[in-house]
């Protein structure tokens, strides 16, 4: 395993633990007298004005639209690296986690729709349980230390990266509403400039960031979710240049600690603070939270494990070396930790306008993700040999 992947896994695992702490603090603040401070912080008005261009949003939306674009930039860099020279490079390496990820997105969505398909409003949240929080999942896996084989860590990493790619496609296709053609035109021109820079082998990441900022503003104004700008920029930055170190790997190395230790924990803090005031047992057992929790805890392992088993039995793919189906099942349960990614999709599906839907969708995510984390940890602990 390369040094960059080792470092990635260490940072994701440590970041996952900080993420959990941030979410717990948010839940405590949202349900104590500190809730006033918590909500005042999230609603803090922030305005950026350059000439006639003005963007004014509360801090919560700057976190969700701005900082999360940086997260998706790192995702774009990771996916490109893994596709070209990492754990997804070549058909043999990519097929098994790709098929597993496909099952892990289809089954949770179908289970969610079994509960919510008849309701026109809640049906929009079908993609909520399709996501996996890689930082949280790796954080739980890290609790078992060196008992976890490298091949299993790389499998989870590859699976989660493909899952992220699927989520990006879902956001672009299904969670984009009113579109401004003028802003899309500026976005298209920005992408063309980035593509030309990549083709010419421009290695200065600062130039990509300048054009990328224009792209982010254009996509934000277009009605398409602004985080997609991050993915596009990540794919456009070259992995290799004729002289000097890799621009893509250098930028990923610089940004990853900020994402793991600041951006994702801040996102969790800003979005996990669900007030339990007014929450009832009947509401908690209603179709929305039950569908989300079932999609995460039942749908994820069902889809990942079934598709993995079929792929191997049909000869389409083979198990990675050093991994058995017991470990695959344990990892498939861990992938039911949707947390930040599921909360992100819930915010796109329901927004913050409907407090009831927002509250119960987040509670469903927290229940499903927590159950998946506890059970997944237990199964993984039982399936791995003890290190003496």
From Swiss-Prot:
What's the short name of a Pfam family annotated to this entry?
Na_H_antiport_1
Keywords assigned by UniProt, alphabetized: Antiport, Cell inner membrane, Cell membrane, Ion transport, Membrane, Sodium, Sodium transport, Transmembrane, Transmembrane helix, Transport
Indicate the transmembrane segments per the record.
Answer: 13-33, 36-56, 59-79, 95-115, 125-145, 154-174, 179-199, 213-233, 259-279, 287-307, 328-348, 363-383
Which residues pair up as cystines?
Answer: none
Gene3D superfamilies the UniProt entry points to = Na+/H+ antiporter like domain (1.20.1530.10)
Q: Does this entry carry the keyword DNA repair?
A: no
Q: Does the keyword Ion transport apply?
A: yes
Topology term for the membrane: Multi-pass membrane protein
Kindly list the places in or outside the cell where this protein is found, as annotated in its UniProt entry. Answer: Cell inner membrane
Please report which protein family the annotation says this sequence is part of: Belongs to the NhaA Na(+)/H(+) (TC 2.A.33) antiporter family.
Q: What is this protein called?
A: Na(+)/H(+) antiporter NhaA
């Amino acid at each position: 395993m390369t040094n960059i992947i080792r470092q990635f896994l260490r940072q994701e695992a440590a970041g996952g633990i900080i993420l959990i702490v941030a979410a717990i603090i948010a839940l405590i603040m949202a349900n104590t007298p500190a809730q006033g401070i918590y909500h005042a912080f999230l609603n803090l008005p922030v305005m950026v004005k350059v000439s006639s261009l003005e963007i004014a949003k509360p801090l919560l939306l700057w976190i969700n639209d701005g900082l999360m674009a940086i997260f998706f930039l790192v995702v774009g860099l990771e996916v490109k690296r893994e596709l070209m020279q990492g754990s997804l490079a070549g058909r043999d390496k990519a097929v098994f986690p790709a098929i597993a990820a496909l099952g892990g997105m289809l089954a949770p969505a179908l289970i969610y729709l079994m509960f919510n398909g008849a309701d026109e409003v809640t049906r929009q949240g079908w993609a909520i349980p399709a996501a996996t929080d890689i930082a949280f999942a790796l954080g739980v896996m890290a609790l078992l230390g060196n008992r976890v084989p490298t091949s299993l860590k790389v499998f989870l990493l590859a699976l989660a990266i493909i899952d992220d790619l699927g989520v990006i496609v879902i956001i672009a296709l299904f969670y984009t509403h009113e579109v401004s053609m003028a802003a899309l035109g500026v976005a298209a021109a920005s992408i063309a400039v980035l593509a030309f820079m990549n083709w010419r082998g421009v290695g200065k990441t600062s130039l990509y960031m300048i054009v990328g900022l224009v792209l982010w503003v254009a996509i934000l104004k277009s009605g398409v979710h602004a985080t997609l700008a991050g993915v596009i920029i990540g794919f456009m930055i070259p992995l290799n240049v004729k002289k000097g170190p890799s621009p893509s790997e250098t930028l990923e190395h610089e940004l990853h600690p900020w994402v793991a230790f600041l951006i994702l924990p801040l996102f969790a803090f800003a979005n996990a603070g669900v007030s339990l005031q007014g929450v009832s047992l009947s509401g908690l057992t209603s179709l929305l939270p039950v569908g989300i929790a079932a999609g995460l805890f039942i749908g994820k392992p069902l889809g990942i494990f079934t598709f993995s088993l079929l792929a191997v039995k049909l000869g389409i793919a083979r198990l990675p070396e050093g991994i058995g189906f017991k470990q695959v099942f344990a990892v498939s349960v861990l992938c039911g930790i949707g947390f930040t990614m599921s909360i992100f999709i819930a915010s796109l599906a329901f927004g913050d306008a409907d407090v009831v839907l927002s509250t119960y969708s987040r509670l469903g995510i927290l229940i499903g993700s927590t159950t998946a984390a506890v059970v997944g940890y237990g199964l993984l602990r039982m399936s791995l040999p003890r290190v003496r």
